[in-house]
Amino acid sequence: MKTLLLTLVVVTIVCLDLGYTMTCYNQQSSQPQTTTTCAESSCYKKTWRDHRGTIIERGCGCPTVKPGIQRVCCATDKCNN
């Protein structure tokens, strides 16, 4: 009986996602829309202009940016579209 209970506990721990994971978009501006599962608790969207036009980068976390780059960070699934 104890073995069965221990087995059920182990299976439950392995099968459950014990830490919350976040889903963020992670494509560059000219790429097809893709998502990734992140360990971080936020998503970001960076926007800037260069000789190619407006560039948009998306991903997990909330990185620091250089002057002239706009950054938006958010904390819900797929919020960085």
Swiss-Prot record:
Keyword Zinc listed: no
An example Gene Ontology molecular-function term: ion channel regulator activity
Compartments where found: Secreted
Keyword rRNA processing in record: no
Annotated S-S bridges: 24-43, 38-60, 62-73, 74-79
Any one GO cellular component localisation term in the record: extracellular region
SUPFAM superfamilies named among the record's database cross-references: Snake toxin-like
Signal peptide (from-to): 1-21
Entry keyword set: Acetylcholine receptor inhibiting toxin, Disulfide bond, Ion channel impairing toxin, Neurotoxin, Postsynaptic neurotoxin, Secreted, Signal, Toxin
Tissue: Expressed by the venom gland.
Family indicated by similarity: Belongs to the three-finger toxin family. Short-chain subfamily. Type I alpha-neurotoxin sub-subfamily.
Function according to Swiss-Prot or TrEMBL: Binds to muscle nicotinic acetylcholine receptor (nAChR) and inhibit acetylcholine from binding to the receptor, thereby impairing neuromuscular transmission.
Name of this protein: Short neurotoxin 2
